[in-house]
Design a protein with these regions (language model features):
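Preference for intrinsically disordered or flexible, low-complexity segments
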Residues: 1-162
Length: 162
């Protein structure tokens, strides 16, 4: 497990502009060393179901992903999912990986059992979720997350992610 320190929680609070909720682990750190993606359990302490296991916290990262979402890439990806069976199969496997990783926490939340994030397994709705999954899981797990990640500039290069 990627432990969460008080310093990490303080950094995430600064990144989000609010107190972070139920951070289970740091799933990915930017090259600058700051948390960039966190793991959140499928049920928050207040009882709310929360299917988004991988959540991007770095404001520089989320800003460049937001810019990428304005380019029409999600529509292109959705078109390819409809016509490319290999891509659709790999994307469905990414959905399965997402659910398996979240399920490994051992927290049963029937409301989100088959729900991943970002539109998986059949469409693309949120590049933030897909990129967060790719950063956390590593390359060759989420093909569309990897594709989006490859299109991003080096968000950490000029300033740390806080």
């Amino acid at each position: 497990m990627r432990e969460v320190s008080q310093g990490d929680l303080d950094c995430i609070e600064t990144q989000l502009g609010r107190t972070p909720r139920d951070v289970h682990a740091i799933a990915y750190r930017c090259p600058c060393g700051k948390p960039a993606v966190v793991e959140t359990p499928p049920r928050l302490e207040d009882g709310t179901p929360f299917p988004t296991f991988y959540y991007a916290t770095c404001p520089r990262l989320t800003a460049v992903i937001s810019t990428l979402e304005t380019t029409g890439l999600m529509g292109e990806m959705n078109d390819r999912l409809e016509t490319d069976a290999g891509l659709a199969g790999a994307y469905h496997a990414a959905h399965d990986d997402y659910i398996a990783s979240r399920s490994a926490l051992g927290i049963d939340v029937p409301e989100v059992d088959d729900v991943s994030a970002g539109g998986m397994p059949t469409r693309v709705k949120c590049l933030h979720s897909l990129v967060a999954h790719s950063l956390a899981a590593g390359p060759d797990v989420n093909p569309l997350g990897d594709e989006a990640l490859a299109k991003l500039p080096e968000w950490w290069k000029n300033n740390p992610c806080e």
